[in-house]
Amino acid sequence: MSGWESYYKTEGDEEAEEEQEENLEASGDYKYSGRDSLIFLVDASKAMFESQSEDELTPFDMSIQCIQSVYISKIISSDRDLLAVVFYGTEKDKNSVNFKNIYVLQELDNPGAKRILELDQFKGQQGQKRFQDMMGHGSDYSLSEVLWVCANLFSDVQFKMSHKRIMLFTNEDNPHGNDSAKASRARTKAGDLRDTGIFLDLMHLKKPGGFDISLFYRDIISIAEDEDLRVHFEESSKLEDLLRKVRAKETRKRALSRLKLKLNKDIVISVGIYNLVQKALKPPPIKLYRETNEPVKTKTRTFNTSTGGLLLPSDTKRSQIYGSRQIILEKEETEELKRFDDPGLMLMGFKPLVLLKKHHYLRPSLFVYPEESLVIGSSTLFSALLIKCLEKEVAALCRYTPRRNIPPYFVALVPQEEELDDQKIQVTPPGFQLVFLPFADDKRKMPFTEKIMATPEQVGKMKAIVEKLRFTYRSDSFENPVLQQHFRNLEALALDLMEPEQAVDLTLPKVEAMNKRLGSLVDEFKELVYPPDYNPEGKVTKRKHDNEGSGSKRPKVEYSEEELKTHISKGTLGKFTVPMLKEACRAYGLKSGLKKQELLEALTKHFQD
């Protein structure tokens, strides 16, 4: 009997997606709670097209290249997010409310190759001329009207949005210096946007005499409490500086789930679970229709094998053979079997940090931070708990249930103290590292071959080699070369480039530099460790383990018909292992699948008939 989880499910169905998102939010699931939406608001006045030297890019060129970089990264990481490009300070206008000097180039939609190519036509000298012919330059704009147009773009979107942001690119620090009424309306409109959950980020560019943010934009932009203020107040003079600033603002902190931490029956606080490190993977392949090259939507239907009729979810049930009887389970019963506990963290006790060993590591840890959305006052109690755990050097042991249908984990909440750099900027946030603890079956005894201990002289020589090869390691300095080349190939296909850009493999060792540093240490180490006649390129003879015989094979196990019938009648056939069941099916010429349940059904049906 088949399951019912995917009845009439259509992948890509937007209505189903919205319903699924609401259900996942209610259950504390990991799935996203909506789409990110981002509007690039670019100043198109004449000053943005003037560079301070011939070798430098114009502020407008830097802005366009930054926007293209975000488009490409969004296509790779989250292609369901919504992006838009709006120019203000243009001679011509194009917007839904017919405001002057505002040109909406791209409305909020998914990023794609066509949009990147559309931006590409405005780069360089030829792009500047094309922009002049297509839109022109104007100065009689109102920033409040510009923000109004952006707010309308957000309101026209039918999807559920988790974050709504505007990135403003400009090199004009006082746009309404001669018109206090326009400046006042702009400040009011920016406050209205902030109240409705729309955040405005300033990407200010270098101008002659410097960019003074206090003249106007200090009251306009939105700054979170935990944000790096240097990112806001540093003006960008180079493309690398602007890219760094945009990347710092592009990614929003998104909780994997928001759960309740139960300290006891009466005291509950709400926390957010965050994933600080995520392994980068290739995106999954998408099935396309051969004739039109459009994505294929998968639909699942269940039919009766005897009549060919369509089965509804109420027509099917789950079954399990136990004790020679077929046990029928209803849908509610199977769901109840999967449900162990409500999503959340249950405090079980405290243990000293010294009891947490390195070999207890199972998987990357998560990060726990207080949330005020579910329980008001959680931050205060969370902070008190963190301080006491740091003082007493203990970890909180908890039972962690991430979702309703997931078995609970035993975890240790390891306290983490806040760290600041020399300029009092937060480097490490305060909170708890959620460390997954192993179960008994996760700990195994691994057979180790007997090793020959190194002599003190050999150890000393290796220490000297390691000391020579030391360098400052930064994880963000090394990229996965396979992934980088994969994305460059996709970029070349999407943008119709002649050939993809070759990715540099930064993981390869710098052999020449290493040899120069080590000098004669390598040869000295070889003389100490390896015998004189050692050939590193020679074939190594594989040693056989003591328990391995010379060509001995596992004998086949045969079962008599009476023995199998006895087990079937007593309902003990399920005690047989899968290899034993396969051998029995093979002996009687029975065709069956690879699963144990299918093997049991084949043997039972054969002997009962």
UniProtKB/Swiss-Prot annotation:
Residues 12-24 have a biased composition (Acidic residues). It comes from the Eukaryota. One of its GO terms (cellular component) is nuclear telomere cap complex. Coiled coil: none annotated. Phosphorylation by PRKDC may enhance helicase activity. Phosphorylation of Ser-51 does not affect DNA repair. ADP-ribosylated by PARP3. The modification Phosphoserine is found at S2, S6, S27, S51, S306, S477, S520, S550, S560. This is X-ray repair cross-complementing protein 6. It comes from Homo sapiens. PANTHER family: KU AUTOANTIGEN DNA HELICASE, X-RAY REPAIR CROSS-COMPLEMENTING PROTEIN 6. The modification Phosphothreonine is found at T455. GO terms for biological process: activation of innate immune response; cellular hyperosmotic salinity response; cellular response to gamma radiation; cellular response to X-ray; double-strand break repair via classical nonhomologous end joining; double-strand break repair via nonhomologous end joining; innate immune response; negative regulation of DNA-templated transcription. Residues 578-583 are annotated as: Interaction with BAX. Residues 550-609 are annotated as: Interaction with DEAF1. The gene is XRCC6. Residues 277-341 are annotated as: DNA-binding. There is a cross-link at K287, K317, K556 (Glycyl lysine isopeptide (Lys-Gly) (interchain with G-Cter in SUMO2)). The modification N-acetylserine is found at S2. GO terms for molecular function: 5'-deoxyribose-5-phosphate lyase activity; ATP binding; ATP hydrolysis activity; ATP-dependent activity, acting on DNA; cyclin binding; damaged DNA binding; DNA binding; DNA helicase activity. Disulfide bonds: none annotated. The modification N6,N6,N6-trimethyllysine is found at K570. Its EC number is 3.6.4.-, 4.2.99.-. Changing K556R: No effect on suppression of BAX-induced apoptosis. Residues 373-482 are annotated as: Interaction with XRCC5. Keywords: Acetylation, Activator, ADP-ribosylation, ATP-binding, Chromosome, Cytoplasm, DNA damage, DNA recombination, DNA repair, DNA-binding, Helicase, Host-virus interaction, Hydrolase, Immunity, Innate immunity, Isopeptide bond, Lyase, Methylation, Multifunctional enzyme, Nucleotide-binding, Nucleus, Phosphoprotein, Systemic lupus erythematosus, Transcription, Transcription regulation, Ubl conjugation. InterPro entries: Ku70, Ku70/Ku80_beta-barrel_dom, Ku70_bridge/pillars_dom_sf, KU70_core_dom, Ku_C, Ku_N, SAP_dom, SAP_dom_sf. It is found in: Nucleus; Chromosome; Cytoplasm.
